Design a protein with these regions (language model features):
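Short amphipathic alpha-helices within nucleic acid-binding modules
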Residues: 281
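Conserved acidic donor-binding segment of nucleotide-sugar-dependent glycosyltransferases
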Residues: 268-275, 284-289
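A short, histidine- and acid-enriched strand-loop-helix "catalytic/donor-clamping" loop
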Residues: 95-108
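Short, acidic/turn-prone active-site loops that include or flank metal/cofactor-
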Residues: 99-101, 149-152, 275
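Charged, glycine-enriched surface loops/patches
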Residues: 84-97
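A charged, aromatic-enriched C-terminal amphipathic alpha-helix characteristic of glycosyltransferases
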Residues: 286-320
């Protein structure tokens, strides 16, 4: 490999470009290309597999001749793409990046026994939580690294139609165990009103795409933003929302989880444990405009400095001494 690797990302960055994670990933790679940290990058979009057949995405990866493949979706494990790639490109470095999280007892929705078959073809697995690093390493027989979500870097936007007192953007999933978040938000809403956007959820429907396009305006314009992941039990784990609520200029009222202040210290976000505490903090910042703006600015500055995808990719490259 030369000193400037060529990188392939496997994921929906073409199909769903407006996701803050996806736009942040492309932004980070383009910055690194401009700075000559990488020679080039390309995307193997999941739609190629869905549209053109089982092996189409493999051909895209192989024909691109990357030095490093980052599998960003679990389809790679379910479809055994790491094996097919390794057969054709024996010297390529392959990374499986798991930005999602499920508690151990869920066995990753029953896919675990299939996924671990790809372990022998992976050089590294990155996880967005610290609790499961040893478990994944043992069952996959691969090295693991903590590597959470990041955020896209862009200016704070404003649109008066989104100037809600308190907003939450995310799905309303009533199934167990995801309904714990629903219960928490409903409890807060009974104490102080919460505007819930995208209750129906989904990634590819037109309504969701419209929300993604306007997400910067939503977080930048709302006075306060509820920042709650589906799970808050794992050390270091938060969904992508945790990084781009602040990265897009929101005054984030965040559910506390283990390790949260290592990622965003108090003062860049406002943390709570109970619905009553969330209510108190929401009402305080609704009534203190200057303090609210300070949180927005500090949170964004912190996100841009420590949690951009340029930073994330440099962390990964450093792990491999690239």
């Amino acid at each position: 490999m030369n000193n400037k690797p060529k990188v392939c990302i496997v994921g929906n960055m073409i199909t769903l470009p407006y996701s803050p994670d996806h736009s942040g990933i492309i932004q980070g790679l383009q910055i690194l290309k401009d700075k000559e940290k990488i020679s080039d990058y390309f995307i193997a979009d999941i739609s190629q597999h869905q549209t053109y057949g089982e092996r189409a995405i493999i051909e895209t990866i192989v024909n691109g001749k990357p030095d490093l493949v980052i599998h960003g979706m679990t389809d790679s494990l379910s479809q055994e793409w790491p094996r097919f790639v390794k057969e054709r490109l024996p010297n390529v470095i392959q990374v499986m990046s798991m930005w999602d999280y499920r508690p151990d007892y869920m066995n990753y929705d029953g896919f675990w026994s299939k996924w671990i078959e790809s372990g022998r073809y992976l050089d590294l697995i990155t996880l967005s939580n610290k609790n499961q690093l040893k478990w994944w390493a043992k069952d996959f027989g691969a090295k693991t690294m903590y590597w959470p979500h990041g955020c896209v870097v862009k200016s704070i936007e404003y649109d008066s139609q989104y100037e809600f007192d308190t907003v939450f953007v995310g799905s309303r999933n009533e199934s167990t165990p995801y309904n714990e978040r629903v219960k928490l938000i409903d409890a807060i809403d009974r104490l102080t009103p919460v505007k819930w956007v995208n209750e129906g959820g989904g990634d590819s429907n037109s309504a969701r795409i419209g929300i993604w396009k306007d997400l910067g305006k939503i977080y930048g314009s709302a006075k306060t933003t509820l920042d709650i992941s589906h799970f808050w039990d794992a050390d270091g784990y938060a969904s992508g929302r945790y990084f781009y609520t602040s990265g897009l200029g929101g005054c984030a009222i965040a559910k506390r989880f283990p390790g949260c202040e290592e990622l965003f210290p108090e003062g860049t976000k406002i943390y709570f444990d109970t619905p009553e505490e969330a209510m108190d903090k929401i009402k305080y910042y609704l009534n203190h405009n200057d303090e609210r703006e300070k949180i927005k600015i500090k949170g964004k500055e912190w996100a841009n400095k420590y949690h951009s995808y340029e930073v994330r990719f440099l962390e990964l490259f450093n792990w491999f001494n690239l």
